[in-house]
Amino acid sequence: MDFQKLAQELKKMQNTLSKKQKEFEEKVFDFDYKGYVLVKIKGDLNIEAIEIKTEIVDPEDKETLQDILRAAINEAISITCKERDAIMNATIPKGTGLF
């Protein structure tokens, strides 16, 4: 086995993964939660913006709004993480025994 060639391949794979991860972290994803809330979240899971439809804002029922916001943010995070994992898994060659 040529360890130098293997080391070069690993370095190349590491560079590719780092590049894809950085690109993903900078990308902004829009998630529309049931038409009530739009969450804009970056791949690094920082929330860029939250837009709320006026019709769901009821000053006398803040609990419902809080529940909707929590659900929207959790869904945005979950979907973003799944997309990140899919991209990373597609980048790592199968059968390498590395992961």
Swiss-Prot record:
It comes from the Bacteria. It holds the Pfam family YbaB_DNA_bd. GO terms for molecular function: DNA binding. It is found in: Cytoplasm, Nucleoid. Its main location: cytoplasm. Signal peptide: none annotated. The keyword Amino-acid biosynthesis does not apply. This is Nucleoid-associated protein UU088. It comes from Ureaplasma parvum serovar 3 (strain ATCC 700970).
